């Protein structure tokens, strides 16, 4: 079983902002996030959209977020 829960995109975005990611630009639902010493990440989810555990684990690899950050 995955250590990652299923959460709403808005909650994940708030958690990413909490660990230092900043909004660089936005075009529709595509948000480009940046953080010092990390490559930019495109966050392409609507706020109310549910993000499953497998996708959340993939996002974590690119952003450095942990289950405790949520």
Regions found by a protein language model. Give the residues of each.
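Basic nucleic-acid-binding interfaces
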Residues: 1-70
